[in-house]
Amino acid sequence: MYKIIEVKQSVFEDNNKDANKLREECKDKGVFLLNVMSSPGAGKTTTLSRTLEKLKDRMKIGIMEADIDSDVDAKTISEYGVRTIQLHTGGMCHLDADMTRQGLHEMGMEDLDLAVLENVGNLVCPAEFDTGSTKNVAILSVPEGDDKPLKYPLMFQVCDVVLINKMDVLPYLDFDVEKCKENILYRNPNAKIFEVCAKTGEGIDDWCNWLENEVKAWKE
């Protein structure tokens, strides 16, 4: 006599319960939790740096940097004078809701308006696990190609916002912006899309204005 357990299903069910509890906790405390995902090198940290330049004097922000190892990104972000914590995943390619909760509590969330999780660079695993975030953001860089939403559907289905980054290299690459937008909206008709260049600051104002309005609405 034996029992068959669908482990993957059980893991996701447990995580979803944890995620909903964390979302409720964030709502009760007025903390907007932003989950930022992308492939390695798409520009997450540079985009966050630009975002901090615009918003750090307008709201209280905390940043959680998730990596398999190293603290390179945390060092970069901490230079902006915001609360920063490094989360090492111990080889795991994503964060789940419980890891995120531990990071938030360790960092201290009581007085924050915005908590940002820079997830592990990966277009597959992070999309599978609900972190308890208020909103999910995917960053897609021009060098990756305009077909990424077709190849990695779940990432773009779970995201509320997509930032098309590195627009400065557009003239040098075979990348169709309108086709990319079409592919994103094919996967997620409700996705908000911003064209940005974290290096030059192009489009960052529009992105930050949207984010600031979302944070205010969440806290009401």
Which ranges hold each PLM region?
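Residues at alpha-helix caps and immediate loop-helix transition turns in enzyme cores, especially N-
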Residues: 47, 96, 148-151, 176, ...
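Conserved C-terminal guanine-recognition region of P-loop GTPase G domains, centered on the G4
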Residues: 126-133, 142-190
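Active-site glycine-centered loops adjacent to acidic/histidine catalytic or metal-binding residues
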Residues: 67, 165, 197
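Canonical P-loop GTPase G-domain recognition
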Residues: 169-220
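Nucleotide-state-sensitive switch-loop elements of NTP-binding domains
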Residues: 2-37, 42, 46, 51-134, ...
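Residues at the C-termini of beta-strands that transition into short coil/loop
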Residues: 88, 140, 197
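Short histidine/acidic/glycine/proline-rich micro-motifs that form metal-
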Residues: 12, 90-91, 168-170, 200
